[in-house]
Amino acid sequence: ELIEAVRLIKFLYQSNPPPKPEGTRQARRNRRRRWRERQRQIHSISERILSTYLGRSAEPVPLQLPPLERLTLDCNEDCGTSGTQGVGSPQILVESPTVLESGTKE
């Protein structure tokens, strides 16, 4: 069943090739706009097909988190830098009561 669903989704995506880069700027823009709209429709149809075949909802299961007053961010390495450094492994520390309790600076 899953292989059939994947084949069907693959066929849907193959039936909508990217637009040709010819014609006036306006014509190319319109073709890209229509192509993106068809891609969105194919994406939503694909989600419905997968949820039907797999028997589960497309909605993500909500993540269970501890109460907000017990959450802190671990900022050991390069917190002030921009870019993508340190993005790979965010850490959440639990049970640090003094960090979020008072809103005043010491």
UniProtKB/Swiss-Prot annotation:
Compositionally biased spans, kind Basic residues? 26-37
Know anything about its domains from the record? The RNA-binding motif binds to the RRE, a 240 bp stem-and-loop structure present in incompletely spliced viral pre-mRNAs. This region also contains the NLS which mediates nuclear localization via KPNB1 binding and, when the N-terminal sequence is present, nucleolar targeting. These overlapping functions prevent Rev bound to RRE from undesirable return to the nucleus. When Rev binds the RRE, the NLS becomes masked while the NES remains accessible. The leucine-rich NES mediates binding to human XPO1.
The protein's GO terms of the molecular function aspect are: DNA-binding transcription factor activity; RNA binding
Residues found modified as Phosphoserine:
S82, S89
- Could you provide one GO biological process annotation from this protein's UniProt record? mRNA transport
Protein name (record):
Protein Rev
Q: Which family does it belong to?
A: Belongs to the HIV-1 REV protein family.
**Keyword set for this entry?**
AIDS, Host cytoplasm, Host nucleus, Host-virus interaction, Methylation, mRNA transport, Phosphoprotein, RNA-binding, Transport
Region labeled Homomultimerization — which residues?
8-16
Pfam families for the chain? REV
Q: Main localisation, per the record?
A: host cell
> Where is the segment annotated Disordered?
14-39, 82-106
Q: Where is this motif: Nuclear localization signal and RNA-binding (RRE)?
A: 24-40
- Modification(s) after translation: Asymmetrically arginine dimethylated at one site by host PRMT6. Methylation impairs the RNA-binding activity and export of viral RNA from the nucleus to the cytoplasm.
Please name the source species.
Answer: Human immunodeficiency virus type 1 group M subtype B (isolate BH8)
Cited function: Escorts unspliced or incompletely spliced viral pre-mRNAs (late transcripts) out of the nucleus of infected cells. These pre-mRNAs carry a recognition sequence called Rev responsive element (RRE) located in the env gene, that is not present in fully spliced viral mRNAs (early transcripts). This function is essential since most viral proteins are translated from unspliced or partially spliced pre-mRNAs which cannot exit the nucleus by the pathway used by fully processed cellular mRNAs. Rev itself is translated from a fully spliced mRNA that readily exits the nucleus.
